[in-house]
Every structure is written in C-alpha cells, then in structure tokens.
C-alpha cells in the first residue's frame, strides 16, 4: 500500500505501536501527539489518510476534541480520508463521527488485521477521489476549449 498517513494520538505508546505496525505499509508515516499541529502539517504535505484519536485531554472521553479536529481537517484542501480511533467508542459517537465526515471508526485496542483492512479500504477510496478530481479537471478543460 502506498500513500502517506498522519497519525494523531496523545499516547506515545499508541503512536509507537502504529508506526511499527504500519512502517512497511505506507511510504510516509508521520506521528503527532499535539492536535494543534494538524493543520500546519496538512499545509506542508499532502496526506492520504489521517488516523485521528478522539480524546486528547486527560480525563475527557466524550470525543468532542476528535470531532472538532475532524471538522477542521475536512475543510483543508486536498481533503484526506479521516479515520477516527478511540478507547471510549460508543454507537452514538461513531454515528456522529460518520455524519460529520469520518470514513471509519476504530476502537482501541484494535485488531491488526481489521485495522489494516480499514486502512486499505481508505486508501482505495482516496485513490478513487484523486482519479475523480483528475477527470473533473480534464472535463473542465474540455468545456473551456469548446466554449
């Protein structure tokens, strides 16, 4: 699997585990503990997938921080695929995340095979989005040439 992934989680152990597990599966893996740096990183490089934790403040487990950053990420161009990850998953939070634009929702501790399948599906979706955008650009140029 090619592509670039940004993993955002306040837990260094989670970041290390994901980095180790995914290092041969992506061409670039960036890990980040502080979500305040997400938009800066997305402005510097084009990531295909963002794997985003839902909670960053100790003792807070309602997912509002993850939803906040999800909405911010989805306003960036080009828009990466966002998969949320949390230890405090519930159905209502997952539904809200999906309605807000997340592609998938993973609960910690994750199953490596399932996580990999989720990331592969996300990468295929991202590749499809890129191809659609290329076709739209070509179509626009053709229409401009005709007119």
Predicted region positions:
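Active-site beta3 strand of CheY-like receiver
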Residues: 45-51, 55-56
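Short amphipathic alpha-helix used as the core "switch/output" element in two-component signaling
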Residues: 59-78, 96
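Flexible nucleotide-interacting loop at or near the entrance of a catalytic core
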Residues: 114-147
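Two-component/phosphorelay signaling modules centered on CheY-like receiver
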Residues: 12-30
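A Lys-centered signature of the CheY-like receiver
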Residues: 108
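Short hydrophobic/Thr-rich beta-strand motif most characteristic of the beta2 strand and flanking loop
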Residues: 26-35, 41, 61-63
């Amino acid at each position: 699997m090619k592509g670039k992934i940004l993993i955002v989680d306040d837990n260094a152990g989670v970041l290390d585990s994901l980095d180790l597990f995914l290092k041969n599966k992506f061409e670039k893996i960036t890990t980040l503990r502080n979500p305040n740096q997400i938009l800066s990183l997305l402005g510097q490089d084009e990531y295909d997938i963002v794997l985003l934790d839902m909670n960053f403040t100790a003792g807070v487990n309602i997912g509002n921080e993850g939803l906040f950053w999800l909405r911010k990420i989805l306003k960036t161009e080009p828009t990466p695929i966002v998969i949320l990850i949390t230890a405090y998953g519930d159905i209502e939070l997952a539904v809200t995340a999906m309605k807000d634009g997340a592609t998938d929702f993973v609960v910690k501790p994750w199953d490596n095979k399932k996580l990999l399948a989720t990331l592969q599906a996300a990468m295929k979706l991202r590749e499809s989005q890129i191809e659609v955008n290329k076709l739209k650009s070509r179509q626009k140029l053709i229409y401009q040439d005709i007119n």
